[in-house]
Each structure stands twice: as C-alpha cells, then as structure tokens.
C-alpha cells in the first residue's frame, strides 16, 4: 500500500507506525523506516515510544480487531481513541527492552532493503525504456 501523496516536510521521526484513519484502508497499520508526514491517520514514532517495533507487531497481530473498529458505511473511519482502547497485555519493561534489542536490527535491515528495492525500481524504470528504444546497449 503506497501513500496517497507525499510532502516535503516530515512531522514524525523514524521509525514510524501509521494506522490509516479513513477510507477503504481504515485501520491498516504500516511501518516506515524514514521520517514521514503523517496525515489522516494515527501514528506512533520513536518520540512517542522507544518500543515502536513491539507496537507495530502488536498492531499487526490485532489486525482483525483493528478492522472491526471501522465506523461508518460510506466512508469508514478508525479513531485513535478506539485504537487506544484495544485490550492489550503489556509485557514488563525488561522484556520490552530485550525485544527491542533483538528485533531492531531485523527491522532496520528491512528498512535498508526496502530503500534498495526503491532505488533499483527507479533505475529499472529509467533504463528499460532506453534499452527498448535502442538508446543504450548492453
């Protein structure tokens, strides 16, 4: 799922979790490994909690519950107050710290690989038309 639009200024600090607030994707949780401009969504970033990756996994695990929070027929909405009211068992602080210590490198690697994929796709999109039009040879 791609953002509907981009902004040249971020209002969050990576890593960032967004939960879509309205529309067909209301309740969809996404993790960004870059600063983003969060709009029409609920979000948590590294300034909100040091346990962003734990919260992200928790939200993904509670996807069915998030989907059930949608209100409204024509334009579904998921409100922050409803997300905050989800029943959740929070592990002790030491367990959260351990989870973050061991999980962070994996999530950071995922972020690096996503950025590489993005750059490779851009290269492909620039080079393929030139290759097809015989502007370059290999």
Short names for language-model regions:
Residues 1-63, 67-84:
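A short beta-sheet element
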Residues 49-50, 61-76, 81-138:
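Amphipathic alpha-helical coiled-coil/heptad-repeat segments
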């Amino acid at each position: 799922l791609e953002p509907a639009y981009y902004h040249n200024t971020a209002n969050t600090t990576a890593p960032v979790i967004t939960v879509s607030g309205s529309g067909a994707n209301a309740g969809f949780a996404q993790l960004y490994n870059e600063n983003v401009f969060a709009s029409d969504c609920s979000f948590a970033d590294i300034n909100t909690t040091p346990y962003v990756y734990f919260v992200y996994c928790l939200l993904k695990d509670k996807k069915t519950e998030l989907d059930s929070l949608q209100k409204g027929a024509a334009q579904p909405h998921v409100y922050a107050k409803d997300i905050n009211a989800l029943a959740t068992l929070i592990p002790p602080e030491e367990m959260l710290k351990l989870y973050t210590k061991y999980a962070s490198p994996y999530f950071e690697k995922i972020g690096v690989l996503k950025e590489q994929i993005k750059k490779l796709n851009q290269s492909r999109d620039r080079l393929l038309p030139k290759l097809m039009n015989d502007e370059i040879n290999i």
